[in-house]
Swiss-Prot record:
Pfam families: HrcA (PF01628). It comes from the Bacteria. This is Heat-inducible transcription repressor HrcA. Belongs to the HrcA family. It comes from Mycolicibacterium vanbaalenii (strain DSM 7251 / JCM 13017 / BCRC 16820 / KCTC 9966 / NRRL B-24157 / PYR-1) (Mycobacterium vanbaalenii). The gene is hrcA.
Amino acid sequence: MGSADDRRFEVLRAIVADFVATKEPIGSKAIVERHNLGVSSATVRNDMAVLEAEGYITQPHTSSGRVPTEKGYREFVDRLQDVKPMSGAERRAILQFLESGVDLDDVLRRAVRLLAQLTRQVAVVQYPTLTTSTVRRLEVVALTPARLLLVVITDTGRVDQRIVELGDGIDDGQLAQLRDMLGSALEGKPLAAASVAVSDLAVHLNGQGGLADAVGRSATVLVETLVEHTEERLLLGGTANLTRNTADFGGSLRSVLEALEEQVVVLRLLAKQQEAGKVTVRIGHETEAEEMAGTSVISTAYGSAGKVFGGMGVLGPTRMDYPGTIANVAAVALYIGEVLGNR
């Protein structure tokens, strides 16, 4: 790339930085005064004319200033040399805040609230998808001799509790035996395989007396928990941040809010995140959702030990602090995976 092209990109970068900071169209005089480009205002004006002709910036109204287009933001993001680094103290504070979560729900609620505060945008976190989960542990607790509490804990930290009513009561020895049988069938297996294994166990013991009835009743409840509990869940935080930037959406804020409420569009975008640590930036029409026009989505996946648990990210107007937001999304995702993987 020639020096003129490099200089024009520096002009574009200055326009993006100043427009994000001020919300005002940027003129050549302001660029020369604020940025040490080493060229005259006339040269900057010529560069801006080329950038406008190529579709990177546009003139919003009669103002002499220019603002970035979606194409301009994309060029800026694609050529980011440095993402704003977070200090060690900031990283430790994030990790400590997330580690204080008492369970999966609390960790994810803390994560979405923290990400919204850090970025001043809407934060979204997808609950771990059950299809990729394995059963870490099964607890069987006798509430009464004929009433059991089954607690299924997945490797992502998800906890499901179910009550089983038995036909006949069981004693402590039978309870331990039941726990061992069910645990052997379930633990360490993906949810689909675990449901098959516990069903096979019930079929094998059917009609043999002893614990067969207790196993059969428990298996029915467990299969419902493992297979039928398939809804996708999404946590949102910071929706009030959208109202601070109403003008940036060009009248499309209502459709963005409706998309957030319905969740389908956002879940589809997050489902595309298949690699933890890789941050994706979708700008405007790159979201491929009409209701999200004028919106940028910065997303990644979170997980542990090479396994993806779910997607997360932020969305807001295209006029966004991309370097800072990318860094925050990456850091929070990293620490969610670390916290959940250690539980």
